[in-house]
Amino acid sequence: MQSSSPSTSHCSQIPIKIQHHIAKKRQVRRRRVDLDCGCSYYIHLDCINHGFTHRGVHHCASSNEWRLYLRDNKSPIFHDNQTQSEPIQQQIQHTNIPNQIQPQLEEGTGDSQMFSQLPHLDDLTVSDWSFFKSL
């Protein structure tokens, strides 16, 4: 019996489990970068134009990013190597507070702010409460 499909190519599709198995074996293309602090990281080759901040120091991952940080005056190739090899320090925009934990307000037993404008809440009847519960 002939196939009713108009296609002349009758290849079977690869099962998804086999596709996943093949994808797991594929090498991830990435580059290792060692930092001055002793840490190292791997950067995927597709993410080469993205920098990151580590321990308050910004690290550039491409010459385009260097050009951005050097305000595009001239190509980073023409700058001295000391400027390029040193990571750019980010300025801290906040004041140093010794205790970074904010205290939580204690719960009070008085009226809450939301119900302070509603008078006579203690005078509600059972039918009033049942009406509110039905909403």
UniProtKB/Swiss-Prot annotation:
One of its GO terms (molecular function) is structural molecule activity. It comes from the Viruses. Its main location: host cell. The keyword ATP-binding does not apply. One of its GO terms (biological process) is symbiont-mediated suppression of host innate immune response. Multifunctional protein that modulates host antiviral defenses and promotes host attractiveness to insect vectors. Acts as a suppressor of RNA-mediated gene silencing, also known as post-transcriptional gene silencing (PTGS), a mechanism of plant viral defense that limits the accumulation of viral RNAs. TrAP suppresses the host RNA silencing by inhibiting adenosine kinase 2 (ADK2), a kinase involved in a general methylation pathway. Also suppresses the host basal defense by interacting with and inhibiting SNF1 kinase, a key regulator of cell metabolism implicated in innate antiviral defense. Inhibits signal transduction by the phytohormone jasmonate, making the infected plant more attractive to aphids, which are the second host to play a role as a dissemination vector. Acts by binding to ubiquitin precursor RPS27A, thereby preventing ubiquitin degradation of JAZ. Belongs to the geminiviridae transcriptional activator protein family. Monomer. Homodimer. Homooligomer. Self-interaction correlates with nuclear localization and efficient activation of transcription. Monomers suppress local silencing by interacting with and inactivating host adenosine kinase 2 (ADK2) in the cytoplasm. Interacts with and inhibits host SNF1 kinase. Binds to ssDNA. May interact with host RPS27A. This is Transcriptional activator protein. It comes from Tomato yellow leaf curl Sardinia virus (TYLCSV).
